[in-house]
């Protein structure tokens, strides 16, 4: 790769090359679109990779029924604006059971509405490759995951049964029923993502920017009161605080951080001084009985 490219242009070129290779190599790929900052970068890269043509695979959102309202609105706006094929899947069994992170807990909610829902959708549509926005700097189990992450016929990830990746050579051979999770952003950092969003003018949900929002402090985490379904427990007060989100997911399981960063340059400045992981606000990551590695072995993203 040219030494004259900036590090962001090198990362961009690497990601685009991975996307083009998957589109050429697999029969039925899909991009998992979770509506966050990494998904927004993936969408931007996919549009660049196949411009001026249409993105040659659909985008799929596994909707848990508990996403921030703004995320759903943003998702639909992006689909209408850019004209990509959007698949939205909700686990019908979970909906029928009335699964809620408040009444059933974070582990059961994640297992049924996210993991089981994702596996249902992949099987239903017969996808043999699925793009995801995970990065190696996010979390320790993701740090050892390959760009082409092999999954067996049950969508399980076995960290001891992965393929060597030499330079930019990837092995995409799968038998019927098996699949590959593909992570084009593996070598990006959170700071890279924000700098790229700023330089490329990529649209993101405004939840990433600091604003006054209604929150409740629960177990040391600031949870935003996004709708009327959130129960306020005895002794809790809804407070209006200047907060933003470093990561987005189900609103009852995603903690806000107090911040004054209302613009992208201010977020980047904040990232340069930050010493904590962006996933510190994810309640599911604090559930020792359901670690990320265990979830991935069961078929999680």
Curated annotation (Swiss-Prot):
UniProt GO BP: hydrogen sulfide biosynthetic process; sulfate assimilation
MF (Gene Ontology): ATP binding; sulfate adenylyltransferase (ATP) activity
Keyword check for Transferase: yes
Pathway: Sulfur metabolism; hydrogen sulfide biosynthesis; sulfite from sulfate: step 1/3
Reaction(s) the record says it catalyses: sulfate + ATP + H(+) = adenosine 5'-phosphosulfate + diphosphate
Nucleotide-binding as UniProt keyword: yes
Family, per entry: Belongs to the PAPS reductase family. CysD subfamily.
Stated name of the protein: Sulfate adenylyltransferase subunit 2 1
Organism: Shewanella sediminis (strain HAW-EB3)
């Amino acid at each position: 790769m040219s030494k004259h490219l900036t590090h962001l242009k090198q990362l961009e070129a690497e990601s685009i090359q991975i996307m083009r290779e998957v589109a050429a190599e697999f029969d039925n790929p899909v991009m998992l679109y979770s509506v966050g900052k990494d998904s927004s970068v993936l969408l931007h890269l996919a549009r660049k990779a196949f411009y001026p043509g249409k993105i040659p695979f659909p985008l799929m959102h596994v909707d848990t029924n508990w996403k921030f309202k703004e995320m759903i609105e943003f998702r639909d706006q992006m689909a209408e604006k850019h004209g990509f094929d959007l698949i939205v899947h909700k686990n019908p069994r979970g909906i029928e059971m009335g699964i809620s992170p408040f009444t059933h807990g974070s582990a059961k909610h994640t297992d049924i509405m996210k993991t089981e829902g994702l596996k249902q959708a992949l099987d239903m549509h017969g996808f043999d490759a699925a793009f995801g926005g995970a990065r190696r700097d996010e979390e320790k189990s993701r740090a050892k995951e390959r760009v082409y992450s092999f999954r067996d016929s049950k969508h399980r990830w076995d960290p001891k049964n992965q393929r060597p990746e030499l330079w930019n050579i990837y092995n995409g051979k799968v038998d019927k029923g098996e699949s590959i999770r593909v992570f084009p952003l593996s070598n990006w950092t959170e700071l890279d993502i924000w700098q790229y969003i700023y330089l490329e003018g990529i649209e993101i949900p405004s939840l990433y920017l600091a604003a006054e929002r209604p929150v409740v402090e629960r177990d040391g985490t600031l949870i935003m009161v996004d709708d009327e379904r959130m129960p306020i427990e005895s002794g809790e007060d809804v407070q209006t605080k200047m907060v933003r989100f470093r990561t987005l997911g189900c609103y009852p399981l995603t903690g806000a951080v107090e911040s004054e960063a209302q613009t992208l340059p201010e977020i980047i400045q904040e990232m340069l001084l930050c010493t904590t992981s962006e996933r510190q606000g994810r309640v599911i990551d604090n559930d020792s009985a359901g670690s990320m590695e265990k979830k991935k072995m069961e078929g999680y993203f």
